[in-house]
Amino acid sequence: LYDIDPQRLEESHLMLTALNNNLGNKARIETYCGVENRRAALRGANYAVNAIQVGFYDPCTITDFEVPKKYGLRQTIADTLGIGGIFRALRTIPVMMDFARDMEDVCPDAWFLNYTNPMAMLTGAMQRYTGIKTVGLCHSVQVCAESLLKTVGMPYEEDNVRAKIAGINHMAWLLEITDRNGNDLYPEIKRRAAQLTEKHDNMVRLEIMKRFGYYVTESSEHNAEYLPFFIKDKYPELIDRFNIPLDEYPRRCVQQIADWEKRRDELTRNPSLA
């Protein structure tokens, strides 16, 4: 485990230690704090999992929203592309390059698994300008089929659903969705989607599925920014029609920070954590 924040590092260590204890103590967990110890943390690694945020929510994420808004540019998430994504990339790419330089020296054959946004910009920078093998990942792939089925009122059982997903980092397509017997679920999904009348959180994604034939992995908030069809200053009625939550990410961050502070002690002191 590596972090530049000793408190966050200790919290992560406590939780992983509890998990390890409850799963048979099969892992050896070591911690490294501070930039001066980064090379030691990476030395000999086969994989490096990256999940960082440069600049924190306050002030940087706030700035990513407030500056564009001042000039009439509205956003929902602002962590992948557009003005907010560019801001985030400009402050994060230099840190990623530092990671890469260290990895080239102490673990040149390791895979860099990136969970940090802006996904495409950061992964692209690593692939173009470093010698480190890099893959961009997002948890949306794991929950894609479940979110679609629940949106249209169909049951989701992990053991009964098969999904084939492909695409670029942070923007992939659900190419196939079947039950365990190979029956295509898309026809029934699309039939039910066409009958929905109440507003819901997946309206942008269902509109994309209607137009292109396939469901996308990323949320409606993300896709409202990815495509130039939804957030239009000349057509503000689209915001309401597709239930697009402008300024969603700052609200989400505030709630997540509050939830984390509330749950932190419970998690780190829970002897049955697994």
Model-identified regions with their sequence ranges:
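Metallocofactor- and cofactor-centric catalytic cores in central/energy metabolism, strongly enriched
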Residues: L1-I62, I77-A78, G85-Y156, N169-L174, ...
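Glycine-centered flexibility motif
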Residues: G34, G72, G82-G85, I165-G167, ...
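A solvent-exposed, charged loop/short amphipathic helix patch at secondary-structure junctions
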Residues: E66-G82
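Long, compositionally biased stretches enriched for glycine and/or charged residues
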Residues: G153-A274
